[in-house]
Regions:
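Conserved helicase motor
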Residues: 56-62, 135-139
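A contiguous loop/helix-start segment that scaffolds small-molecule binding in enzyme catalytic cores
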Residues: 2, 77, 154, 158-266
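Glycine-rich, flexible N-terminal cofactor/catalytic loop recognition
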Residues: 1-58
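Short active-site oxyanion
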Residues: 26-32, 104-107, 153-155
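A glycine-rich beta-strand to alpha-helix segment
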Residues: 73-118, 164-168
């Protein structure tokens, strides 16, 4: 093999979802840099990888970059894997790749399982356009800004089971979404419905595993500023506070909450 460094996609759940090429490379390289050696060791034992494993995660990636460059300079071959999917895509790897590119080290990437495409391929969609966010920020304001930015595009993101309900509560309850979990595993599940329906379902059912969410694109029926002001005035007359008005209007029309607040206090 002429290349010295390999980015290798690994299964996202089902251990059989690995390519023959990936197995061949992981059996051949001298070292495998892993997000978590314990996770990769399970794969190594199943397929007989004999390479030495060492950790390379978001907390030591800069330090490990130096080690990997040193190994390559010594003529060794190194593969980078994450716990699931492709390194550098919502996983550690981008810092290392930058360092390798700056050193003009040849990189070969091996494609494989991907949670986003596995999820999207099973969904009915009005259009093919989508924006992949990665892990959505925990901050509610940042979430609102992202959802407002992509309100006319199918917006796809990862979320943890512990935060899913809280994140969904920050989206208009009548917005159509899809939620996938445990993809490629025995208990794989995909639910499609309104935010309200999905919240009610997962309040009654166990929520485990990695989560992928798609917020369906809104129809492009923009509301004029005058109409927004009219709705705002109605709520003012009903005695709602500026904060509550901003929240209600932004969820009804998918508008940025800060934009609505500015209209409220004009």
């Amino acid at each position: 093999m002429s290349a010295k460094f390999f980015i290798v996609a690994t299964p996202i759940g089902n251990l059989s979802d690995i390519t023959l090429r990936a197995i061949d490379v992981l059996k051949t390289v001298d070292f495998i840099a892993c997000e978590d050696t314990r996770v990769t060791r399970v794969l190594a034992e199943k397929y007989g990888f004999g390479a030495k494993l060492f950790d390379c995660h978001k907390f030591n990636e800069k330090e490990r970059s130096e080690k990997i460059i040193s190994l390559i300079d010594e003529g060794k071959t190194v593969a980078l894997v994450s716990d699931a999917g492709t390194p550098g895509i919502s996983d550690p790897g981008s810092v290392l790749i930058k360092e390798l590119r700056e050193k003009d080290i040849e990189i070969t990437s091996l494609p494989g399982a991907c949670a986003v495409t596995t999820f999207l391929s099973q969904l009915p969609r009005n259009n093919e356009e989508y924006a992949f966010i990665g892990f959505i920020p925990r901050n509610k304001k940042q979430q609102e800004e992202i959802l407002a930015k992509y309100k006319y595009t199918n917006c796809v993101f990862y979320e943890s089971p512990n935060r899913l309900i809280e994140t969904l509560e920050n989206i208009s309850l009548d917005r159509r979404i899809a939620v996938g979990r445990e993809l490629t595993k025995m208990f794989e599940e995909i639910k499609i419905g309104t935010v309200q329906e999905i919240i009610e379902y997962y309040n009654k059912n166990t929520l485990k595993g990695e989560i992928v969410v798609m917020v369906y694109a809104q129809e492009q029926n923009d509301v004029s500023e005058e109409e927004l002001k009219s709705k705002i005035n109605i709520l003012k007359e009903e005695g709602f506070s500026p904060k509550d008005i901003s929240k209600i209007i932004s969820k009804l029309y998918g508008e940025n909450k800060n934009k609505i607040y500015k209209l409220v206090i004009e």
